[in-house]
Amino acid sequence: NSVSALDHDLSRHDGVDRYFVIQQGNGPLNSGTGLFVATTLTNGNYYYAVTTVVNGTEEVTLVPGANTLQIPVAETVSAPQPVFQQTRAVGSKTIEIYTNFISSKYAVGMPLMNKAGFIANDFILFRNNATSGKHPLRIRFHGGGGDFFLNSTSVQGDELNINPEHFLPGGKNAYWWGANENFNILDSDSNESSPINGVNYDFSQQQISRIINWAITNLPVDTNRIYLEGSSMGSIGAYFYALRYP
């Protein structure tokens, strides 16, 4: 759709529209650019097509070279990685902003986690001048009324700090868990009542796991000193994550 490339987290914080960077070193996508993210589940060659839905009816006519590929894309399964967006100054300190993209198609032969197709959330990394050695890592879950910029450079000693976000594109938050497969995460107002059936998927917690695994691989982190911190609603996020992924 017309806002699929919109970085909802950064736009909400800045109060103006910001768009995703999908390849490090490139600029953000242009306004109105369509974006769809799919994670390869099996090695192979893939063709993709784009269809449109008008007044509830999908136009499925395929025109090679126009709305469908003529040459397949060779894809290989690998662990999804966050995409660097930008650096910013918070006071006199530098933070880095990344985006985690999660495909709703998580397993071959299984239904989508959500009809939205993909879920994207940002997180902030404050390196605290750590370049080598082994440092503690703090994952900070913000409370209600705040966002992922809250206390992003507040650290103790030589620890690194990561502040994740969990808002859904429609404006609701995922309560650091996720959502039901039938919940419309793109348009909160369309959810007149809570879903009474379907599977509840923990894609927000999956994002936290990906962040931690990425940090262990790419940052000077002491794996014996990874801490979760939360205030108010963020306490729920830290507590629930520790219970599910001890």
Segments predicted by a language model, with ranges:
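Recognizes extended acidic, P/S/T-rich segments that occur
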Residues: 1-44, 56, 227
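Extracellular fibronectin type III
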Residues: 53-84
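N-terminal cap/lid segment of alpha/beta-hydrolase-fold proteins
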Residues: 75-133
